[in-house]
Amino acid sequence: MHDLLNEILDEVRPLLGQGKVADYIPALGGVRPDQLGIAVYGNDGQVFSAGDAETLFSIQSISKVFSLVQAIGHSGEDIWQRLGHEPSGQPFNSLVQLEFEQGRPRNPFINAGALVICDINQARFAAPSLSMRDFVRRLCGNRSITSDSKVAESEYQHRSRNAAAAYLMKSFDNFHGDVEDVLRSYFHHCALSMNCIDLAKAFGFLANQGFCAHSGVQILTARQATQVNSIMATSGLYDEAGNFAYRVGLPGKSGVGGGIVAIVPERASVCVWSPALNAAGNSLVGMAALEKLSARVDWSVF
């Protein structure tokens, strides 16, 4: 596997230079776009990596999966009274659909849905940002994981559209907490700094029927893990979930920091990172690397 990962990275490196980093978040705009890393965490506990797999990056929307798992853990099926699990077919920060559907987000991976999940968690935890950080630390077994306060503040200063979504949902009585407090927590979650190895390990429980092998803790039931994977498969890649299913064939979740996590049920979890994004906001080179990996080892679930 180690040799295969290096071979795949060599094959996709010519694509470096295409795409564009997420400069609409100023703190992310200065990230070097020529970086590329990948890690695979098997259900047997083995870790394989190549390239810049130990370089920290901002996980951004990948954090939405962690928030969702926290909410399911303490509230179960009740969360679906406030949001759905359908693909949106609209931009991840769309307000039009939210207005039309009376403040009920389509799924937990568009921004409005993630804010509802954060609102649910805010009511549950005394210190939501610390609870999230500690949860992620336990999932990956790395107690040095932190949130980048500069990235979080940069996002908070450009919060207008997210704030608009939150206040719109509040007008439909689907947002109960203080908007500014929830936004602060949301951006701290997005600003978690992790590397490919950390993220591959942190998502291992979703490839293992909800069981985190290295900690010995059942994070979700097997059924719940399957449900989370299904939402990742249909809604995890912004407006490119269909293309990702066609090319890679795995449940996945991306972030504008350039990371993509993919789940191989019963087998492994994978994280690839390269900061330059395509037009849909997903890592251009990362998509290509995952496509090659899935094809070489026949990992598609379809």
UniProtKB/Swiss-Prot annotation:
Which UniProt keywords are present, listed alphabetically? Hydrolase
Gene Ontology molecular function: any one = glutaminase activity
Q: Which Gene3D superfamilies match?
A: DD-peptidase/beta-lactamase superfamily
Q: Which enzyme type, at the first EC level? A: hydrolase
What is the reaction catalyzed? L-glutamine + H2O = L-glutamate + NH4(+)
Which superkingdom heads the taxonomic lineage of this protein's source?
Bacteria
Pfam families, per database record: Glutaminase (PF04960)
Q: Which InterPro entries match?
A: Beta-lactam/transpept-like, Glutaminase
Asked if the keyword Cytoplasm belongs to this entry, the reply reads no
Q: Does the keyword Transmembrane apply?
A: no
- Which residues are listed for substrate binding in this entry? 61, 111, 155, 162, 186, 238, 256
Gene Ontology biological-process entries: glutamate biosynthetic process; glutamine catabolic process
Q: How far does the signal peptide extend, from start to end residue?
A: none
* Enzyme nomenclature, EC number: 3.5.1.2
Q: Which family does it belong to?
A: Belongs to the glutaminase family.
- Assembly and interactions? Homotetramer.
Specify the protein name.
Glutaminase
